[in-house]
């Protein structure tokens, strides 16, 4: 019987590609991984034998890079879904660990790359207010903020102002998710930044646990649909496509947000 991939195992590969979504290096890393597996005697399955699940998996990365990158991810998935599954997975884990240690240890030259910027951003966060760091993130990431940042992250103006004044030393998972959504910032990176600024996560309530569940399941998947004539987009941290009916019936409002660039809507709100 074919080996079934669990969410956790999908996440290992997805996390690898998501961490390296800086596409100037992603292509080379995937090439290196494919070559390493082949040198160890792992042969890729034929194209026809690569499962539909592998094809679905690569679709997650089409928005991040070239068709070339998507094909490489499919090759990796094909290598890992054949005989000797556990050995393949072990090899992939070792590869990821080795490369991540090299990144964090500064052994690779990523001058002016997003990876380098992220590390410096975290270092600069020490002893600063969380909101100040987020504003730096906006400026350095090329994201076009809306007319008011607190709207961009989905918080009330009072809550945002209180955070800016340093009133809160804790941040709820719900608000942290809204920050991630508004700024397109990865959840784990937001946690690192928050802790670097001396903030902590609040004790979990039921909603926080639901949010945490989604946040920990995998990379973002965009679900776009029409609502009252406006195009909405849903960011769900999951490795599976979510049916639109399921979203509309059960996902909390905090998951919704309008597409970036809807400045006309903001202008109308301001009037």
Positions of PLM-derived features:
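Intrinsically disordered, charged low-complexity linkers and terminal tails
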Residues: 1-109, 113-115, 267-270
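A short, Lys/Arg-rich alpha-helix, primarily the initiator
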Residues: 107-146, 223-231, 235-254
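Short, basic-rich loop-to-helix N-cap that marks the start of a DNA-contacting helix
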Residues: 167-182
